[in-house]
């Protein structure tokens, strides 16, 4: 077990533009080291937005993208880890037995495991996400606009776990993945007009969306 909690945060952003165009880009990174050995988290994010007016205001183009990656090394069982650390015989060595290549343990206590054996457990997860969008606005006539919008989202979550025989009877390993993809597109035509004492506001809209989910998981033991 360690005794220092460490965390780093880094952010950077830059932007610029004019009356006809603008952009902004930002990046972020976070690194967190837990107080327990092999427990940590890393996260990276990026974001970009751009806007451009073209053809004397006839067309306005907007683009955006966001992405993130986060990786975690987790502690499987806080209770058993801290309970073992608090109750285990402190005179036992902090290394494996060179003859048996296993951790020394208390055979008469079924719920007390060598706390260093828990440090060999692997429980990792990673999440990746990306989202992009684009919007085109056409100023066709006075009061008449056409908007085209499209977006794509991709998300994947990966989990993996390894429990050696020193902490789990017969051992166990797990691997799983979940993916999600989403496509969205819409078209909107608007017309607004003042005529004498009347005001006309007409809207025509069409939209299409598709989502796909895939994944798998598997667990093995007795190794």
Where are these regions (language model features)?
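Surface-exposed loop/interface segments of Gram-negative outer-membrane beta-barrel transport/assembly proteins
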Residues: 2-3, 35-39, 45-131, 147-223
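A short catalytic or substrate-binding loop motif that flags glycine-/basic-rich loops and adjacent residues
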Residues: 6
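Predominantly transmembrane beta-strands of Gram-negative outer membrane beta-barrel pores used
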Residues: 9-31, 35, 45-53, 62-64
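Long hydrophobic segments that form regular secondary structure
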Residues: 141-142
């Amino acid at each position: 077990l360690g005794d220092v909690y460490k965390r780093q945060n880094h952010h950077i952003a830059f932007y610029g533009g004019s009356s006809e165009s603008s952009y902004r880009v930002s990046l972020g990174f976070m690194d967190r080291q837990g107080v327990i050995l092999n427990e940590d988290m890393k996260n990276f994010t990026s974001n970009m937005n751009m806007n451009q007016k073209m053809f004397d205001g006839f067309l306005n183009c907007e683009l955006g993208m966001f992405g993130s990656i986060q990786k975690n090394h987790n502690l499987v069982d806080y209770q058993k880890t801290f309970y073992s650390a608090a109750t285990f015989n402190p005179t036992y060595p902090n290394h494996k037995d060179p003859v048996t290549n296993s951790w020394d343990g208390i055979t008469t206590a079924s719920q007390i495991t060598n706390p260093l054996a828990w440090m060999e457990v692997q429980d990792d997860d990673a999440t990746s996400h990306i989202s992009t969008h684009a919007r085109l606005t056409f100023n066709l006539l006075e009061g008449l606009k056409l908007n085209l919008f499209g977006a794509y989202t991709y998300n994947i979550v990966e989990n993996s776990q390894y429990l050696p025989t020193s902490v789990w009877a017969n051992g166990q390993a797990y691997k799983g993945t979940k993916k999600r993809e989403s496509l969205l597109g819409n078209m909107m035509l608007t017309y607004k007009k003042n005529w004498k004492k009347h005001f006309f506001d007409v809207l025509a809209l069409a939209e299409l969306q598709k989502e796909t989910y895939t994944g798998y998981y598997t667990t093995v033991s007795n190794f």
